Amino acid sequence: MLKKFFLPDEFVKNIFHITPEKLKERNVKGIITDLDNTLVEWDRPNATPRLIEWFEEMKEHGIKVTIVSNNNERRVKLFSEPLGIPFIYKARKPMGKAFNRAVRNMELKKEDCVVIGDQLLTDVLGGNRNGYHTILVVPVASSDGFITRFNRQVERRILSALKRKGHIQWEE
């Protein structure tokens, strides 16, 4: 059960290791990505210049991006709107409704999309439960909000169990 729900299909150090070329090899046309601690630190209000370049590179290669966050409208809107990136706030991940809405809004199929995030309990679990290819990234910041701190404790136990069973080879 752990493997089925919590094992990501891929693990990368950060969002910048996900390139259009690698996505095109898998025929990916759309990205559903978390915001906080995936794209930027949870308390950073806007995108870094490097992240802006990453978004532009995806767009140039015809890969659509939608930000799907459990955070509130104000936070997600203030980050996403200046970039022209579609977003869904209060997503209630790991529930699948927001993932599926993002796919519909991008006018793609589930098979054409990947889910990217920094949390097993929201991003990976939600993506896996709903049949998406999942990519786990190392959190951008070492600090978290209150609820996420609790989730991280649970995630450490899950990662440890997956590692013990030989399902993962990366270092935490």
Curated annotation (Swiss-Prot):
Leading EC class: hydrolase
Name of the molecule in the record: Probable phosphatase YqeG
Biological function: Has low dephosphorylation activity on GMP and glucose-6-phosphate.
GO function term, MF aspect, one: phosphatidylglycerophosphatase activity
Keywords, comma-separated and alphabetical: Hydrolase
Source organism: Bacillus subtilis (strain 168)
EC number(s) stated in the UniProt entry for this protein: 3.1.3.-
Membrane among keywords: no
InterPro entries: HAD-like_sf (IPR036412), HAD-SF_hydro_IA (IPR006439), HAD-SF_hydro_IIIA (IPR006549), HAD_sf (IPR023214), PGPP1/Gep4 (IPR010021)
Superkingdom as given in the UniProt entry: Bacteria
Database matches in CDD domains: HAD_BsYqeG-like
Signal peptide boundaries: none
GO CC annotations on file: cytoplasm
Phenotype of the disrupted gene, per the record: Required for growth on solid medium.
Pfam family, one: Hydrolase_3
